[in-house]
């Protein structure tokens, strides 16, 4: 059962190491990272290992995998992850989320890391709003890290013209290649 695999028992394939290194880099610089692979290749496990290794005194992390939701529901999930009230309209939740993200970054010195798994199912309105959430202080600072993880189809979604502004903000992008011949023989 893959759920029972402990982080300490991880087989560190080339893909695992590449993703781990890129996640560490993204953690430091903040911004958007995209990770794609076919099902069962270890993306979610690598995310779990990364999240488990975060110092909770230095980072606040949320893992969201219910990606087939409306924009309103997405905002509710994000509010809940940030410890905010979610009973308001979209514009109030958006404002509250941006204020909390800035507070965590600037005042608390505990930047937020948002992991969105199964991101290939996010609708285009959520993708557009993610770009707007990244706008802080007239784009002069990235207050948080956004990790979009999904199947290879996510790359095609991000290549669409409508997602150009979001795509331009991606600072880390990695596509899993699968086990090497050497890794298979080991």
Residue ranges and their predicted role:
Residues 1-30:
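A short, basic N-terminal segment
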Residues 64-67, 158, 171-183:
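Conserved AAA+ ATPase "SRH/arginine-finger" region at the nucleotide-binding site
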């Amino acid at each position: 059962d893959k759920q029972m695999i402990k982080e300490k028992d991880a087989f560190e394939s080339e893909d695992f190491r590449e993703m781990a290194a890129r996640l560490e880099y993204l953690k430091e610089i903040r911004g958007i990272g995209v990770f794609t692979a076919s099902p069962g290749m270890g993306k979610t496990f690598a995310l779990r290992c990364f999240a488990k290794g975060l110092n909770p005194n230095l980072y606040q992390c949320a893992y969201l995998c219910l990606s087939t939701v409306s924009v309103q529901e997405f905002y509710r999930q994000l509010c809940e992850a940030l410890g905010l009230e979610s009973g308001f309209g979209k514009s109030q939740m958006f404002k509250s989320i941006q204020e909390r993200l800035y507070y965590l970054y600037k005042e608390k010195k505990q930047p937020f890391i948002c992991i969105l798994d199964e991101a290939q199912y996010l609708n285009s309105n959520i993708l557009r709003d993610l770009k707007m959430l990244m706008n802080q202080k007239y784009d002069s600072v990235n207050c948080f890290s956004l990790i979009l993880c999904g199947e290879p189809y996510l790359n095609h979604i991000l290549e669409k013209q409508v997602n150009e502004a979001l795509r331009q903000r991606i600072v880390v992008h990695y596509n899993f290649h699968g086990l090497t011949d050497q890794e298979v023989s080991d």
